[in-house]
Amino acid sequence: MKYELKNIKTLNTHDGVAWTASVYRDGKRIGTAEDRGDGGSTWLYLDNRADEADLVAWCAEASKNSGLWMAQYATETIKTHHVGGEQNGTATYELRFNDEMALAYLMEVSDLDKRAKKNIVFRTPRAIPHTSVDTYDTYTLSGRSMATETPASVSAALVYITNKFSNAEVWHSREHMWVSASEMLKDVRAYVPVQVGA
């Protein structure tokens, strides 16, 4: 089973980015999704409401090893404690993987896959003082695609990336996950499709 978003249309608004998309399961349209770009919820409209649990479970499982931000919520319930001072005490809430995170995962994968068709997409960690949140800067190596280049050409690009950014990760669109550039460099042929005549 595979879920994906197609026919994605975006529009910049005053408060963010609005978008609409068709939701597909195994190539068959099963509903639509939208974000109105007003800072509110993301909406999911499925032809059969029972499909929502399957979509959320599939996306949670698919995101676990992806390296994307929502993966941390797929593995367990995150319990966060906020201390509001001595007088206010501590507030606790639980955050579980839900339909909004599932749609965020599908949007992120769709965007990265689209960019990776014509470029090598990679990211590097960015340190933000006094926070434990994983933050990354994402780059593209234009005109180079792991889907169309020869293994030798991709190796040269990976050497450049690892020399410039020692801890870079490259988007692997076939597996929908971030892979360490240095790890990928060890066995490029495992990550690059076999080219005719290469």
Language-model-detected regions and their locations in the chain:
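Terminal leader/tail segments of proteins
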Residues: M1-A198
